UniProtKB/Swiss-Prot annotation:
Residues bound to ATP: G12, P13, S14, G15, A16, G17, K18, G19, T20
Protein species of origin: Shewanella sediminis (strain HAW-EB3)
Keyword set includes Nucleotide-binding: yes
Pfam families: Cytidylate_kin
GO cellular component: cytosol
Keywords, sorted A to Z: ATP-binding, Cytoplasm, Kinase, Nucleotide-binding, Transferase
InterPro entries named among the record's database cross-references: Cytidylate_kin, Cytidylate_kinase_dom, P-loop_NTPase
Catalytic function, reaction form: CMP + ATP = CDP + ADP; dCMP + ATP = dCDP + ADP
Family note: Belongs to the cytidylate kinase family. Type 1 subfamily.
Protein name according to UniProt: Cytidylate kinase
Length: 230
């Protein structure tokens, strides 16, 4: 599989800074953005909207193949806008109902295959920033510009704690840390598309360094691997 336009993959565990860096890179370069972590939630919401039963793999696969979704940057502190069939669903896909439904639809092999093809279809000019967990190993393995962001579990727990506190949630940082460690273990040891850096990825440990520094490191790597990028 060859890429139609330049692709930069940004992989890594939850809380490593993938979303922020991906958004900033897409805005800086004027490229399209794929937030693969939201794809299953978007599909689940589409299924709910279209009254597709969550145990109907055939219908879900067809819906996945034609999923009309966009990820729009340029929203500043509000982050990435997720648009499904022309409607802003950025908040809707974070509901518990949508989360539960996403877990169900993700279990079907044909749904996963359809969404793999749909994610690859995001590769359009002038270029794509692909944010996820297996972008460099599974979805776009042939791109030379791969980045893997990581950070200590403690650092990621603290970031998540700060985010939730800012939103007014009462959270326990020890519980957050435990959940992150458990999720890391599941993700790195799963049989299908485990969370591991691509062999040729640049690994950036974001522990203790600022967003601007991470962005500079990422841009330098991209310009080295993709000389046409300025």
């Amino acid at each position: 599989m060859s890429e139609r336009a330049p692709v930069v993959t940004i992989d890594g565990p939850s809380g490593a800074g993938k979303g922020t860096i991906s958004q900033l890179l897409a805005e800086r370069l004027g490229w399209k953005l794929l937030d693969s972590g939201a794809i299953y939630r978007v599909l689940a919401l589409a299924a709910i909207h279209h009254n597709v039963e969550l145990d109907n793999e055939d219908s879900l696969s067809l819906l996945a193949a034609h999923l009309d979704v966009q990820f729009i940057t340029g929203n500043g502190l509000h982050g990435i806008k997720v648009v499904l069939e022309g409607e802003d669903v950025s908040i809707d896909i974070r509901s518990q109902e949508c989360s539960n439904a996403a877990s169900k639809v993700a279990a079907y092999p044909r749904v996963r295959e359809a969404l793999l093809r749909r994610q690859r279809a995001f590769n359009e000019a002038p270029g794509l920033i692909a944010d996820g967990r297996d972008m460099g190993t599974v979805v776009f393995p042939n791109t030379p510009a791969k980045i893997y962001l990581t950070a200590s579990a403690e650092e990621r727990a603290q970031r998540r704690y700060n985010q939730l506190q800012d939103k007014g949630f009462d959270v326990n940082i020890d519980r957050l840390l435990s959940e992150i460690i458990e999720r890391d273990d599941r993700d790195t040891n799963r049989s299908v598309a485990p969370l591991v850096p691509a062999e040729d990825a640049l690994i950036i440990d974001t522990s203790g360094i600022g967003i601007d520094e991470v962005l500079d490191i990422a841009l330098t790597h991209i310009q080295t691997k993709l000389p046409s990028v300025s």
